[in-house]
């Protein structure tokens, strides 16, 4: 898992507002980016750092669940609360070994602590049934890989309920 920060010239206003409402203080927005492919993960991290302040990466869904406090049932509750409070958005690849991004989405949406965190699914495959299944299960958005800066802007607009 890797966590890095950077300065922002613009923030995802809605996520920032929601983050401020739920957490009551101004701190960096935190995006958890999950992808098993190192190159894709680094690309997503870089694009998000341009638009957001902080990105944590995970190489698979199981690592993401561990980070979110949903992996090991014996984790200390303070660590769980700490990480949950910091995550403003989860962006995950769909197709990963062990656990898919869709399965990660379902786990997040089943969690009382995490269900309000927006989840964006990415895939290099444009399969309408897969896209619809993810959106119906609570994904905020489904994005085609490889991600581009314009996609991050589209994501920001979508989160602000703008028309793309």
From Swiss-Prot:
Residue numbers bearing the 4-aspartylphosphate modification: 93
Domain of life where this protein originates: Eukaryota
Listed SMART domains: REC
Protein name: Two-component response regulator ARR16
Induction details: By cytokinin (BA) in roots.
Family statement: Belongs to the ARR family. Type-A subfamily.
PROSITE patterns on file: RESPONSE_REGULATORY
Any one Pfam family match given in the protein's UniProt record, by short name: Response_reg
PTM section of the record: Two-component system major event consists of a His-to-Asp phosphorelay between a sensor histidine kinase (HK) and a response regulator (RR). In plants, the His-to-Asp phosphorelay involves an additional intermediate named Histidine-containing phosphotransfer protein (HPt). This multistep phosphorelay consists of a His-Asp-His-Asp sequential transfer of a phosphate group between first a His and an Asp of the HK protein, followed by the transfer to a conserved His of the HPt protein and finally the transfer to an Asp in the receiver domain of the RR protein.
Domain Response regulatory: from-to ranges: 30-160
Gene: ARR16
Keyword vocabulary terms for this entry: Cytokinin signaling pathway, Nucleus, Phosphoprotein, Transcription, Transcription regulation, Two-component regulatory system
Gene3D superfamilies with a match to the protein in the record: 3.40.50.2300
Function: Functions as a response regulator involved in His-to-Asp phosphorelay signal transduction system. Phosphorylation of the Asp residue in the receiver domain activates the ability of the protein to promote the transcription of target genes. Type-A response regulators seem to act as negative regulators of the cytokinin signaling.
UniProt subcellular location: Nucleus
Organism this protein belongs to: Arabidopsis thaliana (Mouse-ear cress)
GO biological-process terms attached to the record: cytokinin-activated signaling pathway; phosphorelay signal transduction system
Annotated Gene Ontology cellular component terms: nucleus
